[in-house]
Amino acid sequence: AAIMVETVMGEGGIKVIPPWCLRELRKICTKKKILLILDEVQCGIGRSGKFFAFEHANVKPDIVPIAKGIGGGFPLAAVLMTKKVAKGMIPGTHGSTFGGNPLAMSIGSAVLEQIFKKGFLKNVQNISKYFNSELNKIKKGFPYIIKEVRGVGLLIGLQLFKDQTKFIQKLMDNKLLTIRAAENTIRLLPPLTVKKQEIDLAIKIIKKVCNSF
């Protein structure tokens, strides 16, 4: 038996599971002797400003699926687990057609080397705080368009009052790519190497689109 949740709901509208909730889930799973699985496919590998998003809650899951960020754009995924859980994963119980691809492994290694460079995650934290601050300024200026700015690190959601599809299309027309999520939310997922001037350009475009409604 297990409880499985996304540490940050991606498709669900960029909703961060509160740290207290993750800690309570850990207590429940430990008490009931069931596994806690935290899905970090979208929010892991530095996206939140920490290597794993669950680190913000100071909890330790039993199993962690990861993908996307670990490959830096190349198809790569993994399932991480504690030594205790891994004892049950004997050969044949878990496999992958493309698992162990030498090119993917090399790329994953290069990604980790970059992520763990001194100051890299701190820069993600700093640039994300700046981005969030600027987005909230836009929200304050256009309260009839933007309902909420939410997320963690460089995994940011803008929940809109206006039509999501039109907003995304107008951003695209101005050369800013975003993606939809649930509850009329658009996702802003810049690369972890994004620079301040690129954030400023994105903010300028979002303001321009807000002014067009």
Locations of the language-model features?
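Conserved N-terminal phosphate-binding loop of PLP-dependent enzymes in the Aspartate aminotransferase
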Residues: 1-213
